[in-house]
């Protein structure tokens, strides 16, 4: 099982892209939850943040999970109902491109959505820890 939030959501998505992990490692993945992930880095090229990131179009595409085929692992994207529109869009486009589930968590935003991981009875934990 893998879960990651925001940039960590990007990292767990990249691990799910074909060719990123050795087969003996990827075969052990049973469930992945990107939480408010960055899935398409291309829009960052046109922001002030790119002066630090130095993304080219080529590198943004190369590092964007939505531009790659995912491994066949049970995946569900989680995002807060009160996220900024850009994060909602990132979650929606990842779910659409990867044809995986999308949970929009009621009354949650970017910083408190991970509180779901503190409650073993939350929908997120139930999903993560259900028997495969």
Question: Locations of the language-model features?
Answer:
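Hydrophobic/aromatic beta-strand patches that form the interior of the parallel beta-sheet core
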Residues: 1, 33, 76-78, 103
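Primarily recognizes the serine-hydrolase "nucleophile elbow" in alpha/beta-hydrolase
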Residues: 1-48
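A structural signal for the main folded, soluble domain(s) of proteins
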Residues: 5-8, 16-17, 29, 63-72, ...
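Glycine-rich, phosphate-binding/catalytic loops in enzymes
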Residues: 18-20, 49-52, 93-97
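Mobile cap/lid helix-loop segments that gate and shape the active-site cleft of serine hydrolases
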Residues: 37-67
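Short beta-strand/loop motif that positions the catalytic acidic residue
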Residues: 71, 77-80
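Acidic catalytic loop of the alpha/beta-hydrolase fold
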Residues: 82-86
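C-terminal catalytic histidine-bearing segment of alpha/beta-hydrolase fold enzymes
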Residues: 88, 92-95, 99-132
């Amino acid at each position: 099982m893998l879960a990651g939030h925001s940039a960590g959501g990007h990292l767990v998505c990249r691990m799910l892209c074909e060719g990123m992990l050795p087969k003996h490692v990827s075969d052990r993945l049973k469930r992945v939850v990107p939480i408010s992930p960055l899935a398409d880095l291309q829009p960052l090229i046109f922001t002030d943040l790119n002066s630090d990131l130095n993304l080219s179009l080529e590198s943004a595409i190369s590092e964007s999970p939505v531009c790659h085929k995912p491994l066949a692992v049970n995946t569900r994207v989680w995002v807060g109902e009160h996220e900024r529109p850009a994060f909602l869009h990132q979650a929606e486009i990842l779910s659409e491109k990867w044809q995986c589930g999308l949970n929009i968590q009621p009354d949650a935003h970017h910083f408190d959505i991970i509180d779901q991981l503190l409650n073993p009875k939350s929908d997120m934990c139930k999903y993560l820890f259900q028997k495969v």
